[in-house]
């Protein structure tokens, strides 16, 4: 795979993630989780901007359209994300895919240093997203806060 094709693929992947996060945010019932998911969505938006700018510097036009995979990722997230727990479960799968794809891109040869640096930075974001989602699932944070963002009151479930 050429470096240009790899960067285009990462742009598509991040575009898909933006749409998947939109569905997960809609499904999420807890404000602290929703806020974190919005932050992660913002990271993916920045990835698209940074990678697109890098492609332009390399003399290429970015293709920010989503493809059929993106449609299925967004649809899967919408269908499976009903409530905070299921939104997190759906996004865990999406972030596992994104993290793996970025890891593979970090290992590509013949990539300009400036491009490699952007990919490394984005990969670090993906690792952070996945770790937070895993932590949230492990700690069942939806049980620690009432829907709408209010922490549980003493003596109340």
Where are these regions (language model features)?
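Preference for long, well-ordered alpha-helical segments
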Residues: 94-157
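Conserved alpha-helical segments that form or flank metal/cofactor-binding pockets of metalloenzymes
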Residues: 32-67, 129-140
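Alpha-helical scaffold segments that form or flank carboxylate-/histidine-based iron centers
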Residues: 2-10, 30-49, 84-88, 113-127
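Membrane-interacting alpha-helical segments
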Residues: 1-4, 58, 72, 78-84, ...
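Carboxylate-rich helix-loop segments that flank metal/cofactor sites and access channels
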Residues: 49-99, 151-152
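Alpha-helical bundle segments that constitute or directly flank the non-heme di-iron/ferroxidase center
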Residues: 1-28, 85-110
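Short N-terminal secondary-structure initiator segments
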Residues: 7-27, 41-55, 147-149
């Amino acid at each position: 795979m050429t470096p240009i094709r790899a960067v285009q693929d990462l742009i598509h992947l991040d575009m898909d993630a933006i749409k998947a996060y939109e569905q997960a945010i809609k499904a999420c019932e807890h404000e602290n989780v929703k806020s974190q998911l919005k932050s992660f969505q913002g990271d993916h938006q920045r990835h698209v901007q940074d990678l697109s700018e890098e492609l332009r510097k390399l003399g290429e036009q970015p293709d920010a359209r989503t493809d059929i995979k993106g449609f299925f990722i967004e649809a899967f997230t919408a269908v499976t994300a009903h409530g905070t727990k299921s939104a997190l479960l759906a996004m865990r799968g999406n972030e596992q895919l994104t993290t793996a794809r970025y890891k593979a891109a970090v290992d590509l040869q013949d990539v300009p240093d400036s491009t490699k640096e952007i990919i490394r930075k984005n990969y670090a974001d993906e690792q952070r997203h996945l770790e937070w989602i895993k932590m949230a699932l492990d700690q069942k944070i939806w049980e620690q806060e009432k829907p709408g963002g209010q922490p549980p009151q003493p003596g109340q479930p």
